[in-house]
Amino acid sequence: MTALDDVIDFIDSGANMLMIYEIEKTDAFMVEFASVIRKAAEEIRTGVAGLRTLNDPETIKGCCIEINRLENQGDDILSNALCSLFKTKDPVEIIKFKDIYEHFEIATDKCEDVADVFAAILIRHT
């Protein structure tokens, strides 16, 4: 499943950026992104388990709805993070943090792509 692999790739590359950019302390926005991504991953796990039998399409549908809500929350976090970041005077910090924030937001987009795959499977099998 390419969509699922993309989620993992963006989480991994975002974490690697923390090391590459030598970010010693995460900020509140990164913590929020981590929480949203973790919750979306839990919904993906629940959805994958439900797809094995397709006995409970409502649970899978609920996962899709929640993942979509979490992706929207990721968009909001990015907006707030960038607004706060651009008040910073250090251009190097702006570049580093903007890159990391955008990577984590893309991870939430990729979670939504997985939810879209779930929805397509449900449509075909119900």
Model regions and ranges:
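Cytosolic, long alpha-helical scaffolding segments
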Residues: 1-126
